[in-house]
Every structure is written in C-alpha cells, then in structure tokens.
C-alpha cells in the first residue's frame, strides 16, 4: 500500500514538473509589467524613462502637421522629409516610436461660461454627441547594446540629451508644436497606455486576462494587429504618403492610413509606428551577401530578389537614403460585449484596398502589447516583428494628420467640424496663440441665398457676447433684428435721410500726421475730383491750412465747433492770406 502511495506522489510531482516546464508557473506573465521600467525621472524638466534592459527614452507630445481634409499633397511629403531628417539626426542606435491615440468621446461644453440663451441652446443641441479625439506622442529611445545594464556610460548619456533636444528644435523649425512630458506626466501616460484609458481623469486596472486572440482588461477587450507579416511581407512595391478618395466625383488626397481613426465599434485605438536605426555599413554588407546568395541559385524568384536588392542599393547610393527596421501595429479597444471581429474585417478590407495584408498570425498578443509600451520598443523581436526598408518608405505608413481642435484664443467663434461637434476658431486672426494678422476686418461675399446673413448673424452674436465692438456695413437690412436684439445703434441710408459724416470732429489726442493726411486727401478729392492733379504748392497749402485750423480750435479757441462748414469759412479767409504772405502765384 505504501508503495502505491509513493508511486502516486512521484507521478504527481512529475506531472507538476512537466506542467511548469511546458506552461510556466504564471509568475513570469504576472511580473511581465514589473520588468519593463527601472524608474522615471525628471531631467531638466524632461521625463526620462529608464527600462530594466538599459534603454533611455523621452516622450514628446506633438501635433501632426497635416490638417485633416486639407487636400494639401505637399504637406504629406513635407512630413515624410521631416521624419527621414529626424532619423538622420539621431543616427545609429536610436529608435523613433510614434504613438497616435484615437479616443471616442461625447461632447460636453467645458467652457464653464454663463452663456446667453441662444448660445446655451446651441451647446445643448450638441451635448452628448460622439466624436473622435486624437493625441500624438513621439518617443525617442537610445538602445543599450551591452549586456551589463548597470554600467553607466556618460558619453552615451550626453549624446542622448543632445539628440533629444535637437529633435525638438527640428520639429519646432518645421512648424510642429511639440513639448517633452515631465516625469509625472510621463508616468501618467504609461499608466493610461497600460489600462488603455485615455478618457477618464482617474485610471485603474482590473481583471487582466490574455489569450491568443485578444487582451481583456476590465470592461474592455483589446486586440493587437501587426500590419506586416514578416514571414510573408505583402505591401505595395511603390508607396506614397497619401492616397486618394472620391468626393463628388473628384479625387481628394488623404493620409495613406487615415482609416485608423474611424474603426467601427472602437472606443480607443493606439497606432504604434516604430523605426529602428541600424549601422548602415553593416546592413549594406548583409544586403550584398544576401544578393550574392540569391544570385548563386538561379531561378525566377531568386532573380527577382537580386533585382530588388540592386534597386535598393542604387537608390541608397544615388540619393543617400537610410535603411531602417520598422514595425507597425494597431491596439484596438472595444467594449467587452462588442464583436471585435467587425474591427478585424474592417481593417483587413481597408488595408487590402491599399495593397497591405495585415498579419493573421499575431498570436503573441501580450508580447506585442508589452513591447509597444513607451520606451520598450527594443523588446520587439528582431526575427519576426521587424522588417528592413528605406526610411522614407516606412514614413509613408505613419499617420500624419491631425483632427481639428479648438484654438487657444480669448475670442472664440464656434463652428461645427466634419464630425458635427463645435470647435472654437479665431476668425479675427489676431487674438489667438498663433497670430496671423493685426487687422481683424473681413468681407463676406456670396450670391443671393448662399447664407451670408445666417452666417454673419451667428458670428456677430458670438462676438457681442464676448464684449467685442462690431461695426458692420451691409445692403439689405439683414441685421436690423440682431442690432435691435443686442441694443446696438442701427444707421440706415434713405434718400430722405442720407448718412452724413463729420471727419473734422476729432479729439485733441486724435490729431496726428495720419489724420491730417487723411483730411488733406479728402479736401483734395472734393476740390480736384478723382482725375485732378495736385501740385506740390497746393499740397503744402492745404496741409498748412488744416494744421492752423485745428490750432485755432484747440489752442486759441477761436473756432466754435469742428465741421466742414467752419473749415470752409476759415479756408476762405486764410488761404488768400497765406498766398499773399508767401508771394505764391497760380
């Protein structure tokens, strides 16, 4: 009996050993998130992430430079040039990891202002409407090539600090708004990525579960889609940074991967775009060896490979292009009860139309998710997660567009964007953060029935609510009701009561060279007409009369009031005197 018990006990132990050997104890998976970061520290206001594998990283929050639906083809190419320039600046041993985050939100008026009735009704109409918001982060990571991660290299650290500052300056010079996250903000961003929660003020993580198809966390389910299957790369032979869509039978350029911001059922989407910059000489040498290996075994497929490698080598030699290893993936989050297969079908169909067939073998869901943490991109497997390409070709697969946000301006005029939610625009061009002009006058022109009055009534009402003085000139009495509503002054021209003006009625502080010049030109126009010629003597004469006229009023108090009539009476007396005093002829 004792022998049977011993045999049974040994069998259980052997079974447990086999189970642990095959499947692990669960501890490794449980601690996988604890093994990413060593610390996050502030260095001169920049939050630097230190991974346990010895990499340094800094996170830039930026705005993509291409306005969505701007139809500006040049701006897409300019972004490509910018990305390749950043890669050239960083050089060997660095990685560029760009994360574009798209979040479904419900619109709520957050201005906390006491609106007038019409504005209150306006915002109430849009309250709760769904829209997609986007944010962009650029993570610069320095690779640690040594096995001993605790050996500090001051030279590499200085190089990292210099390079990240160069990147920010380069973005700024290209007109891209960018700023580094500090330590606390960087920690918060990492936590938000971990929980895939970029919406709530407070984030938490509950009930984390992973299988081959998806990752469940709390009340949402996420799936990671790898864009390129390294074992069977299926991408177009020629790519460009934009694609065309048809709008009213007219082609319009949009981002090549613009589909990532409109995935059905998705509450949150993170598009990870990673560039790894290798040693160029070594990669060219490996390419040459690969070409020779294919050439040594003559068959059609090897011959095609040889020709492709030759083309790449020619482009690199002729145009000084840079080789990079790239990885792209999408982390798509949906409600726990939603069918994530709809997202899969949408992505497969949409990318298929672009000639890109996304990987169907992304069974390493947890690995892809963890490797996409900010600063952890070097954990991606070089064998099956990265593919070699040219930097400008890889940049074509980056997301380049920005969704319209409200401008930072004290004068907010609200319009609805293409998603149907209000955004604040500074139409004056001079009050906002980005100054465009110092002249806020504008002209509204359109055919009858095109909506001029409807538009301008809305604009003027919003300006009035923000204590802005508005002077309007209009034909048709379209704004009489608005003027009465806000208690304005309405001046209307009729034959019986024409509009009059008194340009001479000014205050002492308003009298300057510009004002005298204006009045001189006005007098000359009345005197000579539009086609008349004015001599230098006449010009000086009228200028002197105007100057003395105002001196008589402001200084000597000899004129009762300022008007064209009193100026005319003064001129009739004074002009002959000046002519006589200076012996002027003509």
Could you describe each region identified by the protein language model?
Residues 65-71, 96-102, 106-112, 119-120, ...:
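Switch/coupling segment of Walker-type NTPase motor domains
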Residues 2-401:
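Extended, folded cores of ATP/NTP-driven motor/assembly subunits in large transport
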Residues 389, 393-398, 403-420:
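Pre-P-loop entry segment of helicase/translocase ATPase cores
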Residues 77, 161, 324, 341, ...:
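Conserved structured core elements
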Residues 57-59, 93-95, 135-137, 327-329, ...:
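Beta-sheet entry/capping signal
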Residues 125-155, 159, 166, 318-320, ...:
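Helical/strand "switch-coupling" subdomains that flank nucleotide/phosphate-binding cores, especially
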Residues 49, 65, 73, 80-88, ...:
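Glycine-rich phosphate-binding loop of nucleotide-binding enzymes
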């Amino acid at each position: 009996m004792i022998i049977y018990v011993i045999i049974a006990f040994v069998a259980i132990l052997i079974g447990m050993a086999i189970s642990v050997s095959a499947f692990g104890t669960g501890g490794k998976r449980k601690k996988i998130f604890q093994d990413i970061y060593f610390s996050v520290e502030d260095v001169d206001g920049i939050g630097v992430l230190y991974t346990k594998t010895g990499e340094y990283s800094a996170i830039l929050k930026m705005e993509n430079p291409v306005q969505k639906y701007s139809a500006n083809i040049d701006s897409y190419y300019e972004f490509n040039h910018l990305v390749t320039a950043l890669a050239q600046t960083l050089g060997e041993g660095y990685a560029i990891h760009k994360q574009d985050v798209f979040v479904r939100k419900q619109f709520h008026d957050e201005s906390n202002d006491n609106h007038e009735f019409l504005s209150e009704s306006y915002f109430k109409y849009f309250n709760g409407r769904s829209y997609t918001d986007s944010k962009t982060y650029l993570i610069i990571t320095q690779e640690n090539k040594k096995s001993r991660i605790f050996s500090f290299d001051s030279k590499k650290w200085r190089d990292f600090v210099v390079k990240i500052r160069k990147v920010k300056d380069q973005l700024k010079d290209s007109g891209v708004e960018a700023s580094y996250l500090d330590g606390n903000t960087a920690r918060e961003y990492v936590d938000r990525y971990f929980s895939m929660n970029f919406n709530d003020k407070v984030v938490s993580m509950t009930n984390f579960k992973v299988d081959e198809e998806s990752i469940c966390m709390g009340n949402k389910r996420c799936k990671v889609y790898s864009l390129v299957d390294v074992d069977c790369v299926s991408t177009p032979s020629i790519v460009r940074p934009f694609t065309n869509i048809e709008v009213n039978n007219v082609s319009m350029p949009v981002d090549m991967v613009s589909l990532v911001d409109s995935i059905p059922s998705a509450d949150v989407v993170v598009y990870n775009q990673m560039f790894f910059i290798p040693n160029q000489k070594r990669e060219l040498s490996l390419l040459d060896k690969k070409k020779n290996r294919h050439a040594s075994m003559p068959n059609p497929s090897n011959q095609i490979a040889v020709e492709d490698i030759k083309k790449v080598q020619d482009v690199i030699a002729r145009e000084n292009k840079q080789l990079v290893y790239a990885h792209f993936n999408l982390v798509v989050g949906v409600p726990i009860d939603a069918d994530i297969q709809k997202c899969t079908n949408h992505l497969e169909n949409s990318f298929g139309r672009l000639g890109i067939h996304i990987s169907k073998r992304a069974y390493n869901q947890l690995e892809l998710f963890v490797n996409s943490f900010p600063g952890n991109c070097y954990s991606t497997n070089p064998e099956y997660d990265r593919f070699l390409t040219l930097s400008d070709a890889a940049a074509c697969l980056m997301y380049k567009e920005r969704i319209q946000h409200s401008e930072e301006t004290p004068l907010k005029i609200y319009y609805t964007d293409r998603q149907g939610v209000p955004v604040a625009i500074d139409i004056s061009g001079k009050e906002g953060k980005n100054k465009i002009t110092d002249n806020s006058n504008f002209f509204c022109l359109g055919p009858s029935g095109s909506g001029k009055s409807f538009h301008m009534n809305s604009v003027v009402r919003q300006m009035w609510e923000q204590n802005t003085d508005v002077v309007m000139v209009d034909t048709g009495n379209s704004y009489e009701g608005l003027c009465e509503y806000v208690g304005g002054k309405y001046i209307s021209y009729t034959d019986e009561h024409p509009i009059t003006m008194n340009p001479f009625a000014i205050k002492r502080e308003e009298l300057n060279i510009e004002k005298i010049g204006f009045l001189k030109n006005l007098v000359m126009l009345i005197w000579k007409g539009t086609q008349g010629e004015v001599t230098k003597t006449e010009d000086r004469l009228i200028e002197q009369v105007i100057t003395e006229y105002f001196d008589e009023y402001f200084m000597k108090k000899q004129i009762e009031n300022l008007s064209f009539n009193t100026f005319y009476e003064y001129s009739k007396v004074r002009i002959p005197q000046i002519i006589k005093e200076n012996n002027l002829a003509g």
